[in-house]
């Protein structure tokens, strides 16, 4: 959570996590837990941004976070606040605009160059030649999306970190209806980010379902539920994995023995013609699937 002094972060944090903070606590990062559909998000209330020069630690927190909540005080200049936050993030090579490709380059001592992902208008040899220009001879290049050579080159110098974000317009109960409607519409026109309204006094005004589901979707995550082969009981708390994950990835995440001794799995899902369906290790999972692994 990022915002300027008095932006309503602490009230929002309390409503999201149910955790009360004592006076002055916001001078240090404060963690809390947001529960949603069996998934637990760690929410961190950060100290208010006082100046660009004092925001280094906050930007380090933002870079390490999976997603951002930008709190904007509706009683102040909302456009200046949002622009200032986005500029500060951009200055620290953090973007809230989803790029066409995300490239990570992991240097290593041996093994040559391995590319995982898709290229546009370039070949593997083009990438190898480019990396050699920067004295990189051994590396794993991971691509999410489809990357150009320019994307690869930018990643060499430290690519932008993409963070899904939502804008929380706080203290909206202090504005009249027409002013709030006009402000919210203009703000939504000025950014591609979803804008949510929060009264700062009533937690019921918070649309947790919309916020959590948006972040979950933008992070490209899915939920799968495990079924006990002995009892038939389905675990209420899901396993969270990246979209595109396979059955064997879940086996590895549950226990190394399931991964090593994997035989097959059964999948329960409305999308399947036959449910349950017996599948192998490379079967791709979807959100809401129920999985039973036999080893």
Residue ranges and their predicted role:
Residues 235-246:
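Short, contiguous acidic and Ser/Thr-rich linear segments
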Residues 264-281:
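Short acidic beta-strand-loop surface patches of small beta-rich interaction domains
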Residues 98, 102-105, 111-138, 142-147, ...:
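Canonical P-loop GTPase G-domain recognition
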Residues 1-108, 116, 121:
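Conserved G1/Walker A P-loop phosphate-binding module
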Residues 16, 245-258:
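Short amphipathic, charge-patterned alpha-helical segments
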